[in-house]
Amino acid sequence: MPDGLISLIGFFSDFGDENILWPVMALNGLLLIVQARRKIFFQWLALVIVVFGGMLVLKLEFEACGRLPGQNLYSPSGHTAGTTFVYGSMIVLFGRLPIAGFVGALAIALLAGAARVWLHVHSVAEVCVGGALGMLGVLLLTFARYREIQTSSKQKKPDWSVVVLLVGVLIVALSLHGLRSPAEVWLEYFSHRFVAPFRHCPVTLSTT
């Protein structure tokens, strides 16, 4: 693959870094509060905990014993999970058709996962796990959004706050683009140091 194409893929993949995702989620939550959508705000917040907490548990579990020969699933892709859920949930929460948001999230999951594989950062198995976790969060949010639409008595009108959100997300993403979160290194260290003693890790013998 040409170096220019790899650089372009890396550029877009960086929009899924945690340094960008967390501020974007903060903007999402703030807009839900401004719109007085309290119920779906708490449902969305619970799913944030499920998706990111679930990824935390998976990483600690799979990385504990270190990378073993022939192992295809070592570090589930939090990048793919986060990108899928954060940007997919934006479309579901603030779009007119929740199902369109779900389809959009699926497209994001495929592109984000493929990018991580092309960049040789994760295996196919690792991005599949991450994408599945992110899509699970989006799916549950889609159901919640449909219930919100069915129970809402207000007629949907153009909301300029959504435009403000998009502008804010764009500013945040471009401002923080390229900054690398150290979370991955910290998780790997914590897993090796504190989780591994509770696991029955296989012992690999070196030959001399």
PLM feature segments, named:
Residues 183-208:
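Membrane-interface segments at or immediately adjacent to transmembrane helices
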Residues 1-75, 81-112, 158, 197:
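Hydrophobic alpha-helical bundle signature of multipass membrane enzymes
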Residues 59-75, 111-139, 182-192:
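Interfacial helix-loop-helix junctions of multi-pass membrane proteins
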Residues 106, 134, 161-171:
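Hydrophobic membrane-spanning alpha-helices of multi-pass integral membrane proteins
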Residues 88-92, 134-145:
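Hydrophobic transmembrane alpha-helices
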Residues 95-101, 142-152:
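Membrane-interface junctions at the ends of membrane-embedded or membrane-associated helices
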Residues 150-166:
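Membrane-interfacial entry segments at the cytosolic side of transmembrane helices
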Residues 2, 166-181:
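A membrane-periplasm/extracellular boundary helix in multi-pass inner-membrane enzymes
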